[in-house]
Regions:
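Amphipathic alpha-helical packing segments from all-alpha helical-bundle domains
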Residues: 104, 115, 119-124, 137-164
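Key DNA-contact positions within bacterial/archaeal DNA-binding proteins
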Residues: 63
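Basic, helix-initiating cap at the start of DNA-binding domains
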Residues: 1-59, 68-74
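C-terminal peripheral helix-coil segments that are non-catalytic and often amphipathic
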Residues: 1-20, 104, 108-109, 149, ...
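Alpha-helical DNA-contacting segments of helix-turn-helix folds
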Residues: 74-83
């Protein structure tokens, strides 16, 4: 008596390999470019920084960079924005601290600003952008709009809260106070007229609030 052969169970088809995610790859390339720009400007300075060097450090082609940015200054601006965003995320900074003690809050933030200005990772790109923005009005406007203006707004918001709480005079000019806090700090950092210290930051707060 012949036996009927058992039908073979069909083998499962091998799982298809997932196709690379273009968006993720683009994000990685973009971040590599920004990191490379920050590293190189600290190593060689802005004048010697080139798109070719950024591309080589990031492991991408020049055209990849030019597809996203028109110039090395534009790359550096976005790199600085990313750096500032990373720092804000790490510190949990969506606003200035509001503990009810205005002087202490402002001193805390200005001391952190002093630390950033004294950190080579921040110093080199910010100096480069400041210099480039002085001769490139469009870049200067973008630098102000995207990096400086949001930071100034945080100070004004904190001062507005203090004014509402009665800690400042009702007619206090919040923009002027903000610039009085940050202007001398930036001047000393940019021109290196004297050491940039926590004591100087504290003195600025005391002077500004003493005249508010």
């Amino acid at each position: 008596m012949s036996r009927t052969p058992h039908a073979k169970t069909p083998e499962a088809a091998p799982a298809e390999a997932k196709a690379p995610d273009p968006a993720r790859r683009s994000d990685r390339s973009r971040r590599a470019i920004l990191d490379a720009a920050l590293a190189l400007v600290g190593e060689v300075g802005y004048n010697k920084l080139t798109i070719e060097a950024i591309a080589a450090r990031a492991g991408v082609g020049k055209q990849t960079i030019y597809r996203w940015w028109p110039s090395k200054a534009a790359v550096l601006l976005d790199a600085s924005l990313a750096l500032a965003g990373d720092a804000a995320t790490a510190d949990g900074r969506a606003a200035l601290p509001d503990t009810g003690d205005l002087a202490a809050d402002l001193k805390q933030v200005l001391r952190a600003t002093v630390d950033e200005f004294n950190d080579p990772a921040y110093d080199a790109p910010l100096r480069a952008l400041t210099a480039a923005g002085a001769t490139d009005p469009e870049l200067g406007a973008r630098f102000t709009e995207r990096l400086l203006a949001p930071q100034l707004a945080l100070y004004e918001d904190r001062l507005r809260s203090a004014r509402a709480a009665g800690d400042l005079a009702g007619g206090a000019d919040l923009r002027l106070m903000t610039e009085m806090l940050l202007g001398p700090l930036t001047y000393r950092w940019l021109l290196r007229t004297a050491p940039l210290t926590h004591a100087f930051a504290d003195a600025l707060v005391d002077a500004v609030l003493g005249t508010a």
